Amino acid sequence: MNFTAIDFETANSSRSSACSLGLVQVRDGIVTAEHVWLIDPRQRFDGMNIAIHGITPSMVQGQPTFEELWSTVEPLLQGEVVVAHNAAFDMSVLRYCLDASGNSYPDFQYLCTYLLGKKMLDELPSHKLNVISQHFGISLKHHDALDDARAAALILLKLMEQDQKCEPLLLADNQGYTAGKMFAGGYTPFKSPPKKAPRKKQPAKAPAFPPSAPSVKPYF
């Protein structure tokens, strides 16, 4: 049960505008380390984003840029199983920030608790982080990067317990998902295998009359 959960917050709609990163390490099913950083994105802050996470331009003044922070974060992700809620977003933020700073991608596999929750908790009206957290009784200050990362970690532990799987990758495989991968030069998404298209039925052939049969007019 070893994995690392992450969550990014952004200053605006650009995926390269990370302004906070939360990271939670789990070893043998127990949270063993938590980290949170404010990041100076060197970009504008949109009012809508500030309203969501509460991070303002003045709060990131003097904080490291992503490029400056990366040497600290990279060893915490390299070779890990990484987990995020709506991983498509967080992984795209990571890729965009790495591209913008000229850094190569680390090597790790990743899972998405949003998609796993959607598959395993289909009775819930929504599978947003706050809804699944409430379902499992997990305390959450939503859109705080550390709280969101911690909630994703605890949700994964609950899902593994529910599925009686002791490893994240076994859980994903058992639910029909392939782990996403990030590697030098590229990535693959966390996804379920494509559904096979149903075989088309061949149209039934009309029975042929014996050669000696008389012509018959159809009756409707």
Residue ranges of each PLM-predicted region?
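Conserved non-catalytic scaffold segment of RNase H-like nuclease domains
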Residues: M1-F108, D122-E123, H127-H143
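Beta-strand segments within the central parallel beta-sheet cores of soluble alpha/beta enzyme folds
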Residues: Q109-C112, L171
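Short, flexible loop segments at boundaries between secondary-structure elements
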Residues: L111-D122
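Acidic, divalent-metal-coordinating active-site segment for phosphoryl/phosphodiester hydrolysis
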Residues: A145-L159
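Acidic two-metal-ion nuclease catalytic site recognized across multiple nuclease folds
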Residues: L157-F220
